[in-house]
Amino acid sequence: MEVTNEIKTKPTQHSVKELRSIGIQPDVLLCRAKNKIDNHIKNKISLFTNVHKDAVFSAQDASTIYQIPIEYKNQKIDDYILKKLRLPHKKSVIKPWVTFTNKLKKCKRKVRIGMVGKYVELADSYKSLNESLLHASVHNDTSLEIEFIDSEDIKKTNMKMLNNLQGIVVPGGFGNRGVNGKILTAYHARINNIPYLGICLGMQISVIEFARNVLGLKKANSTEFDLSLIHI
């Protein structure tokens, strides 16, 4: 724990003490801190926790979560764990990971993608999609910015909020809440040639929008929202 830029070891000591009081002696400690902890701090933690100083590792903040395995590798935590578990050492396969992480930090271009859904107040609701978009953007040497937009906020009068996007993703969902906003989003993307990726419900939305506004089937919908339909 950092207080006025000084790392305090008491919280770690107390936590390990509590573990030992219930019969658990840690083999390895990962010490969270803003910056890398030095040998003096490691020695102090080791002294008061009965954990060998070589098993005290720094878990400092990183610019991206993908940097963290590299930091652990640099501290040789993998070697220590293998030795502790008496497992054979194998050739490291971290090089592709390092290549990806370095590329992530040096992307030459930038893209802004809108994620239009109804669970956007918690970005991790779409965690797998977020990471998939990130991987795709890095592969194309492009840094990614995702703008999360609540589909219930999208009206005919404010669709211009979508104009600053280079692409739109409408993910899956359930129920009819926010559906009209998603249909407006698909419409806006189509007439303005904004790349649109519809996943699950998002794909249904694009079909509904096209049926209504291009094919003239004004009441086209999904049975998920309306069972008394002519055009399904």
Question: What are these language model-derived features?
Answer:
Residues M1-I230:
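N-terminal beta1-alpha1 cap of cysteine-dependent amidohydrolase-like domains
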